[in-house]
Swiss-Prot record:
Belongs to the RNA polymerase beta chain family. It holds the Pfam family POLR3C_WHD. Its main location: nucleus. The gene is RPC82. This is DNA-directed RNA polymerase III subunit RPC3. The keyword Transcription applies. It comes from Candida albicans (strain SC5314 / ATCC MYA-2876) (Yeast). Residues 523-544 are annotated as: Leucine-zipper. Keywords: DNA-directed RNA polymerase, Nucleus, Transcription, Zinc. One of its GO terms (molecular function) is single-stranded DNA binding.
Length: 595
């Protein structure tokens, strides 16, 4: 991609800049041009893409096939003109961003073989199980083992069945379903057109949800039984479920927040609780919210998200108890006395013969008396290595998560049964990280002013001075920096009908959602900038890097000392940039959560 096209992608939007850069790095020049044009112009045919990019139609079509397979492009055939239209699909491009993290996580949680399966699926976009297992035909036991690993990954929702709707844009699918439902809803003299459209819309929502859930629920077209053993059908085509990995990222974010606010051991308990319900937890993307014009009011959006969460709670899919999470806790950590409950009762008088427990005689069935100790026994279960995990202690940790801080990290729906308020915690997570960023970048005074503005919602300079206990000069200076960073907005309030400047005063306010979106766009832009920086210094030293590839393993003999030093500097520079990229990516993942 030439400099003009890259500059156009950079100026257009942060997402355009990042996605074009990713396509250039992983897929080549033609793919990056196609993605850039689709972001700029929306849905286009292959001929229209060819005319705008000046690339032959034949090359465009062959590139589109690969992009569709890698989940980077949607296609749709119109019924009227029978033409194929293509639009951008973000899933494949996001998989390029997270691919390394996905493989590392699967390797840690499952093993090398499972990571290899996921890696092959990420490379090819989707895989037919039968085709993948042909490489193990020489070893029947290994083939059975691989089949079981596919089944485990599918049951844990890392793999899902590839459906037709995965290749089509949600807008096109919704429009088609809605038109069908509208035709099936007859006009009536006693029913208004508004009510008829609302009925058709309600039916279309049910149909769309049924269609989207069909790939994750087990059915006759997914599973089969061989010798009494459940297996996936050999002709089943599976693809990776990005939403499942994003749930894992949400789990990590919640655990880190608990670790910083309460402590390490409570965070371990919370991690076990989240992992227990992670697979069935609320989705990371809500299809109905992505359809323009369907749910517009912010209150309706919030109610819709909460209704899905409450439905999962009522179905007991995201509820747990101390006994449920007990087996998921690490065996090498002793939780005994990890929660100290102070009591103000007077200490009991010590026994005369020391601290030995009282002995009590119990008459057995055979008439022989047996002495037993009356020392207090706890309801604990002992693991294989002797570590005692006390259910009472786990309950205390859960109570600490419920009442230990101003934030309720769990909700108790019935005695001993808990759930996690995902939507509420997501908003708190974003707020906490945003305030931490303001404090780290702009200082303590800016942080105090931000908290003051948030508490008063709409205030002037004098109110901020009184609330934050700062001088007027300091407040004015910090407000300038906060406004420049788009953290605080100015509200002009005229005192006269002619809006004279001399009679106008200004108020300040903070809007969380707009700030989060602005920060998210900044993070996307920074990720693209880092990737471009890496590519730029690789191009600057292209000859040296090609020479290194030719003599790899014998560079000490064929390269000069200054070349070796420069090569080492390039490697360190790339590592530093990749570390920055990972940090920004982790922060971007937080603000991509839907609350």
């Amino acid at each position: 991609m030439d400099e003009v096209q890259m500059e156009t992608a950079r100026i257009q939007s942060p997402k355009s800049y990042l996605y074009t850069t990713l396509a250039t790095t992983h897929l080549g020049e033609i793919a990056s041009c196609i993605i850039s044009i689709l972001i700029s112009n929306g849905r286009l045919t292959a001929r229209e893409i060819s005319n705008r990019t000046k690339i032959p139609t034949k090359n465009i079509k062959s590139a589109l096939v690969s992009l569709i397979q890698l989940n980077c492009i949607y296609y749709w055939q119109e019924e009227k003109d029978r033409k194929f239209y293509y639009s951008l699909k973000e899933t494949g491009l996001l998989l390029f961003v997270y691919s390394g993290d996905i493989i590392n996580h699967i390797k840690r949680q499952y093993g090398e073989d499972e990571a290899e399966i996921i890696q092959n699926i990420l490379i090819h976009g989707h895989v037919k199980i039968e085709d993948y297992l042909t490489q193990f035909n020489h070893d029947k036991s290994m083939k059975i083992d691989q089949e079981n690993k596919f089944l485990k990954l599918f049951n844990d929702n890392w793999l899902i069945k590839l459906q037709d709707y995965h290749f089509h844009s949600l807008d096109d699918i919704w429009h088609k379903i809605f038109e069908e439902c509208l035709k099936d809803t007859p006009r009536s003299s006693v029913t208004s057109e508004i009510k008829r459209v609302a009925e058709a819309q309600a039916k279309a929502k049910v149909k769309l949800n049924t269609l989207l859930e069909s790939g994750t629920t087990g059915g006759g077209d997914i599973f089969t039984e061989v010798n009494g053993m459940k297996k996936l059908k050999p002709d089943l085509v599976v693809t990776f479920n990005l939403s499942r990995f994003q749930k894992h990222l949400r789990t990590n974010a919640f655990v880190n927040m608990v670790r910083s606010k309460i402590g390490v051991l409570t965070a371990i308990v919370y991690d076990a609780a989240l992992r227990y319900i992670e697979n069935k937890s609320p989705p990371m993307d809500y299809p109905l919210l992505d359809i323009p014009g369907l749910i517009n009011d912010p209150k309706d959006v919030k109610e819709y998200i909460l209704s899905i969460e409450n439905k999962l709670v009522n179905e007991k899919k995201i509820t747990f108890s101390a006994r449920d999470i007990q087996r998921l806790l690490p065996k090498d950590i002793d939780f005994k006395n990890s929660v100290i409950t102070p009591t103000f009762a007077k200490p009991k008088r010590p026994l005369e013969n020391g601290s030995s427990p009282t002995l009590k005689k119990i008459k057995l069935e055979d008439g022989i008396a047996s002495s037993t100790s009356t020392s207090t026994s706890t309801s604990s279960s002992t693991s294989s290595n002797g570590t005692s995990i006390d259910l009472n202690t786990l309950e205390q940790h859960l109570k600490l998560l419920l009442n230990g801080t101003n934030t309720a990290f769990v909700n108790e729906i019935s005695p001993g049964n808990y759930t996690i308020p995902f939507s509420h915690l997501t908003n708190i997570l974003k707020q906490n990280n945003f305030e931490a960023l303001v404090k780290a970048t702009l200082g303590d005074y800016a942080f105090r002013i931000l908290r003051c503005v948030k508490s008063m919602k709409l205030c002037d300079e004098k109110s901020i001075c009184n609330g934050a206990l700062l001088k007027e000069k300091t407040v004015r200076s910090e407000l300038y920096h906060l406004i420049k960073a788009n953290i605080i907005e100015i509200q002009e309030v005229p005192r006269s009908a002619d809006r004279a400047a001399s009679k106008t005063f200004y108020l300040f306010r903070h809007k969380s959602n707009s700030n989060f979106n602005y920060l998210k766009n900044c993070l996307i832009y920074d990720m693209a900038e880092i990737l471009n920086r890496i590519q730029d210094f690789k191009l600057e030293h292209k000859i040296l890097l090609e020479k290194y590839k030719l003599v790899e393993g014998q560079e000490d003999q064929y390269l000069l000392d200054r070349e070796l030093k420069l090569l080492n500097d390039l490697q360190l520079r790339e590592i530093k940039n990749l570390v920055k990229f990972q940090r920004i990516k982790s922060l971007y993942s937080l603000y991509s959560l839907v609350d």
